[in-house]
Amino acid sequence: MEEADRILIHSLRQAGTAVPPEVQTLRAFTTELVVEAVVRCLRVINPDVGSGLSHLLPPAMSARFRLAMSLAQACMDLGYPLELGYQNFLYPSEPDLRDLLLFLAERLPSDASEDADQPAGDSAIFLRAIGSQIRDQLALPWVPPLLRTPKVQRLQGSALQQPFHSSRLVLPELNSSGELWEFQASPLLLPAPTQVPQLQGRAASLLEHHASQLCQHVNRDCPGDEDRVRWASRVPSQEDSRAPQQRLHKQLIEHLRQSWGPLGAPTQVRDLGEMLQTWGARAMTGVPKGSRFTHSEKFTFHLEPQVQAAQVADVPATSQRLEQDTRAAQEQELESLREQLASVNHNIEEVEADMKTLGINLVQVETECRQSELSVAEQEQALRLKSRTVELLPDGAANLAKLQLVVESSAQRLIHLASQWEKHRVPLLAEYRHLRRLQDCRELESSRRLAEIQELHHSVRAAAEEARRKEEVYKQLVSELETLPKDVSRLAYTQRILEIVGNIRKQKEEITKILSDTKELQKEINSLSGKLDRTFAVTDELVFKDAKKDDAVRKAYKYLAALHENCSQLIQTIEDTGTIMREVRDLEEQIETEMGKKTLSNLEKICEDYRALRQENAGLLGRVREA
């Protein structure tokens, strides 16, 4: 344990605890050093909790109790599994202190010495970021594409793609207010969304029309580009050459770059706000109320939704009628099928009810048939007996004499069989009793051996548990060794760990040897006990036969019985002595454990703290009286 204490003290020094060089074991820890070590570890593990605790033990007893209770609560919040109170800090014992400091040392963060070996620079940081992102993505569960939500499909690029189908839209030119008014007042043209019958092609058509308007805006000031403008204002065809397309594509990209500029420029937002303000002002300071143009504009815009609604309603009227007829036919067919299904279900229910009643009747008929068969059999038996009796009635005296002879012969036969049974029963009974005695002896021997085997199993289990515990300690020490910083010299720790492992192996070999010796000794004891019992039984039987005839043999028999009794007492005394020696060893171990807990020193500290607490209370009472 001294090496484990040294490793633990080294960890506490790394956490910032000022452990004196002369302190080499936890037994030498004082109350002040215990409080400082726990507070330093708490500050490293959880700075929010440890920053509010003082690593110096206050002189006042009440403050000491409060600090000890705060430390106990902080350790319990970290998940300390054992019971913890102020006494573990003010009056510590070595085993409890070792468990507490081991618990805190396990939760100390390891040094990031591995980061020092990694390369620095932007490329290394970028590669580490890529690696962390890949690890995070690999940690997520994989979901098949068909089971993903639409949002996830759009984000991961697994959504179903729609082909780009555009249609030509007929819209007014924006450079003439008269043409716009005529277009909106025309009853022959539908709105832009309703001009495309397919829902998937509306967005594509609007984008295509917007691209053509953008091309016209770009090329209206360039001479000689009328062909390109005319090409951009219609749907692209296969016979157009690639060169104008590439030139127009470059012009669009250049125009977008010049017009939009850097992303998030505040000038565009300002221009948009000014434009909205000018439109709002223009709407507020518009034409006077009573002008003829205002009335005609209102009349036009009020009529336009009705005209468009009529146009939209006329187009799908025929399709709606066809759908209504189809639905009516389907509903009629469905209604007839439902009626047929209801009638079939009703017939099935009637048949099932008839089957249930017939089944009940069948069970009743079968029961009656079985009862009638039983009664018929009984009547046949009675009839057979009566017929035999009637046959014997004509010659009654002779038949009675014959019957008497048959009865007497049967009685003689029973007596003969009983005598034969007695002849066979006596030796069988003696053999049974002998076998029963042998079985009892075997059961006693087997129970004794079973008790011995259970004791051996218990000892083996205890040894295996001890070996398993030492293996766990070994693994824990190896893991702690791996978590130590790289700059610390590991040679001494490695050698000491190898020595500990060697000692554990030696102890394991010694335990195995002791167990084997115990087994052999137990076998020898059992064999000797069996020999002794058998020898005594044979001697007892031989001497007992001659003890009735000879007085000397009778005295020898008495001496033999006394010797056997004395040997039994001697064996029992030896077993009691061994039990007492084991209890003495257990008591010595308990005394050593109690000595390690420093009970006397803790009692002296408690008495001193009690006196100091009484003095503080007396001083406080004096202050209260003076006040």
Curated annotation (Swiss-Prot):
<dbReference type="GO" id="GO:0097006">
    <property type="term" value="P:regulation of plasma lipoprotein particle levels"/>
</dbReference>
<keyword id="KW-0206">Cytoskeleton</keyword>
<dbReference type="GO" id="GO:0005813">
    <property type="term" value="C:centrosome"/>
</dbReference>
<dbReference type="GO" id="GO:0032456">
    <property type="term" value="P:endocytic recycling"/>
</dbReference>
<comment type="function">
    <text>Component of the commander complex that is essential for endosomal recycling of transmembrane cargos; the Commander complex is composed of composed of the CCC subcomplex and the retriever subcomplex. Component of the CCC complex, which is involved in the regulation of endosomal recycling of surface proteins, including integrins, signaling receptor and channels. Involved in regulation of NF-kappa-B signaling.</text>
</comment>
<dbReference type="InterPro" id="IPR048349">
    <property type="entry name" value="CCDC22_N"/>
</dbReference>
<dbReference type="GO" id="GO:0043124">
    <property type="term" value="P:negative regulation of canonical NF-kappaB signal transduction"/>
</dbReference>
<dbReference type="GO" id="GO:2000060">
    <property type="term" value="P:positive regulation of ubiquitin-dependent protein catabolic process"/>
</dbReference>
<feature type="modified residue" description="Phosphoserine">
    <location>
        <position position="410"/>
    </location>
</feature>
<protein>
    <recommendedName>
        <fullName>Coiled-coil domain-containing protein 22</fullName>
    </recommendedName>
</protein>
<feature type="region of interest" description="Sufficient for interaction with COMMD1">
    <location>
        <begin position="1"/>
        <end position="321"/>
    </location>
</feature>
<feature type="region of interest" description="Sufficicient and required for interaction with CCDC93">
    <location>
        <begin position="1"/>
        <end position="447"/>
    </location>
</feature>
<keyword id="KW-0597">Phosphoprotein</keyword>
<keyword id="KW-0963">Cytoplasm</keyword>
<dbReference type="Pfam" id="PF05667">
    <property type="entry name" value="CCDC22_CC"/>
</dbReference>
<keyword id="KW-0967">Endosome</keyword>
<comment type="similarity">
    <text>Belongs to the CCDC22 family.</text>
</comment>
<dbReference type="Pfam" id="PF21674">
    <property type="entry name" value="CCDC22_N"/>
</dbReference>
<dbReference type="GO" id="GO:0042632">
    <property type="term" value="P:cholesterol homeostasis"/>
</dbReference>
<dbReference type="GO" id="GO:0015031">
    <property type="term" value="P:protein transport"/>
</dbReference>
<keyword id="KW-0833">Ubl conjugation pathway</keyword>
<keyword id="KW-0653">Protein transport</keyword>
<dbReference type="InterPro" id="IPR008530">
    <property type="entry name" value="CCDC22"/>
</dbReference>
<dbReference type="GO" id="GO:0005768">
    <property type="term" value="C:endosome"/>
</dbReference>
<comment type="subunit">
    <text>Component of the commander complex consisting of the CCC subcomplex and the retriever subcomplex. Component of the CCC (COMMD/CCDC22/CCDC93) subcomplex consisting of COMMD1, COMMD2, COMMD3, COMMD4, COMMD5, COMMD6, COMMD7, COMMD8, COMMD9, COMMD10, CCDC22 and CCDC93. Forms a coiled-coil heterodimer with CCDC22; this heterodimer interacts with the guanine nucleotide exchange factor DENND10; the interaction is direct. Interacts with CUL1, CUL2, CUL3, SKP1, BTRC. Interacts with SNX17 and SNX31. Interacts with CPNE1 and CPNE4.</text>
</comment>
<dbReference type="GO" id="GO:0043123">
    <property type="term" value="P:positive regulation of canonical NF-kappaB signal transduction"/>
</dbReference>
<dbReference type="InterPro" id="IPR048348">
    <property type="entry name" value="CCDC22_CC"/>
</dbReference>
<keyword id="KW-0813">Transport</keyword>
<dbReference type="GO" id="GO:0006878">
    <property type="term" value="P:intracellular copper ion homeostasis"/>
</dbReference>
<dbReference type="GO" id="GO:0006893">
    <property type="term" value="P:Golgi to plasma membrane transport"/>
</dbReference>
<keyword id="KW-0175">Coiled coil</keyword>
<dbReference type="GO" id="GO:0097602">
    <property type="term" value="F:cullin family protein binding"/>
</dbReference>
<feature type="coiled-coil region">
    <location>
        <begin position="448"/>
        <end position="535"/>
    </location>
</feature>
